Amino acid sequence: MILADLTTPAGIEKLVQVTGGTQSYYNHPERADGIATVVQQAITANPNLAHVKVRLMPNLPNAFYNYDRGEIILGVVNPDALAHELGHANNLRQEGLYRKILNAANGVARINNVVALPAMLALRMFVQDPERRDDILKSLSAVSAAIAAPGLLEELSASTTAFQHAPNKLRAVGTLGPAFMAHMATSMMPSAIYQAGRP
């Protein structure tokens, strides 16, 4: 399926069938008509988006943009969530320095998320000088925040785009706000871990 298929009744029907008709926090089958509107607006603004691949996933309680494959993974009927992912697709389908920086930062951030706690614990155990340990942890915290910044800015950009195009701003905040806060918590966790390890 490609994005343009979600402007047709058949595409919308398939989305609802695959993702399930039950309502949950993110899944709102009764808002299916809003999907076509969001997609049409995005394609009108950037016709290249019409050919973005869309993979429908049952039992996925959300949606995301797969940077590596350039496709939207959609598991919910939610125009606001889709508009957010379309923001990513619009930003990241443009080749260039932005995408390279974002991919590199995301790769380093994933590694940092795994090593932050063991690194902090190792520093607490093996670096006996409190001032030196504090300087190292403070530096690691700052570097971690800098590494997280490009990903957070991309999330903010996609959420802002989705909010601007949302017909119901309050409902959009209810969808986009918690998702952004979850991204921020995950992204800033290594920085917080290094801060927590300071004397």
Regions found by a protein language model. Give the residues of each.
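Short acidic linear motifs
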Residues: 11, 83, 131-135
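Catalytic phosphate/metal-binding cores of nucleic-acid and nucleotide-processing enzymes, i.e., regions
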Residues: 71, 75, 102, 109-111
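ATP-binding/phosphotransfer module of carbohydrate and carboxylate kinases, centering on a glycine-rich
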Residues: 53-55, 98-102
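Long, well-structured alpha-helical subdomains associated
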Residues: 106-156, 160-199
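Auxiliary, metal-adjacent structural segments of Zn-dependent hydrolase domains
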Residues: 2-79
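Coil-to-alpha-helix initiation sites in intrinsically disordered, low-complexity, charged segments
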Residues: 95-99, 168-171
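Hydrophobic secretory-pathway targeting helix
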Residues: 1-10, 139-142, 148
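Active-site recognition of the HExxH zinc-binding catalytic motif
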Residues: 80-96
